[in-house]
Regions:
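Second-shell loop/turn segments in exported
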Residues: 34-38, 82-83, 117, 153-161, ...
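A conserved helix-loop-strand patch within extracytoplasmic ligand-binding domains
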Residues: 104-177
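Short, low-complexity disordered leader/linker segments with a strong preference
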Residues: 1-35, 57
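Alpha-to-beta junction loops
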Residues: 86-93, 150-152, 213-222
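Ligand-binding pocket segment of bilobal, Venus flytrap-like solute-binding proteins
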Residues: 179-243
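Stable alpha-helical elements in mature extracytoplasmic
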Residues: 43-47, 51, 79, 88, ...
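General small-molecule cofactor/ligand-binding pocket signal
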Residues: 70-72, 154, 200, 241
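Early extracytoplasmic/lumenal segment of secretory-pathway proteins
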Residues: 24-106, 116-117, 223
């Protein structure tokens, strides 16, 4: 599935159900089978496993075609780079418009993609929360707790993960508020936070694996939907803290 020549890529920004509308660009006749590849970011696996079934029924009713949706998941920035370097994609559903802009700047998407769909082509959202172990043994309540010497943090790498960049921005916004835009203090806060990070995984799901399955760290900075999934799977092991 590695090609240097692309079809037109259909895409949306921050998280993208509506991206599938772009499959209409195919010329396959009614009754034929088609395949589309959705290159997405880390924590959307379960979403698209469910959504693809709904879409397949919708597309069959609308066109008579059977459609097979192939998924590719990883850190958002890494996925964008993979597409730029040759990974075939019919749809991209990434965590940041920055990552999709990079694909556009590489000449693979026509300009104006944000205007193609409502809400700047970002049909759903999440927020950033803390996932802690049941009972919150370190009493972690807010961002300032993450710079304590006794707290080990898990968060993915901002160089490869869209979720990690949102984590970084959320921490920066907190520091901006409590330090009244004093950039020297803000930078010191961020530096200390990342000094407490045990491992910078490449994506949000691998960071969740480090915290949930490997037992690393006292707190995971995560998408809320990713944290909800962990609590759903292991309600006696984890709980969610919503920081300021």
């Amino acid at each position: 599935m590695i090609k240097k020549k692309f079809r037109n890529i259909c895409l949306v920004s921050v998280l993208g159900i509506a991206a599938f509308a772009g499959v209409c660009s195919y010329d396959a006749g009614a009754g034929s089978n088609i395949h589309i590849i959705n290159v997405s970011y880390d924590p959307t696996r379960e979403l698209y496993e469910s959504y693809n079934e709904i879409f397949q029924e919708h597309w069959k009713e609308k066109t008579g075609q059977d459609v097979d949706v192939i998924q590719s998941h990883g850190g958002s920035g890494k996925q964008a780079l993979e597409v730029i370097n040759g990974l075939q994609a019919d749809v991209v559903t990434l965590a940041l418009d920055y990552d999709i802009d990079a694909i556009e700047n590489a000449g693979m998407i026509q300009s104006g993609w944000k205007e193609e769909l409502p809400d700047d082509s970002a049909p759903y959202t999440s927020t950033i929360v803390f996932l802690v172990r049941k009972g919150n043994p370190k009493n972690i309540q807010d961002w300032d707790d993450l710079i304590r010497d006794d707290v080990d943090v898990i968060t993915p790498n901002p160089k490869t993960s869209g979720g990690a960049r949102w984590n970084y921005l959320a921490a920066w916004a907190y520091a901006q508020k409590i330090y009244n835009n004093d950039e020297e203090k803000m930078e010191a806060f961020i530096k200390k936070l990342y000094q407490n990070v045990l491992v910078l995984d490449s994506g949000a799901r691998s960071a969740t694996t480090s915290f949930v399955e490997n037992g690393q760290g006292d707190v995971l900075i995560a998408w809320e939907n990713e944290a909800f999934l962990s609590v759903k799977d292991d309600p006696d092991e984890f709980e969610i803290i919503a920081p300021s």
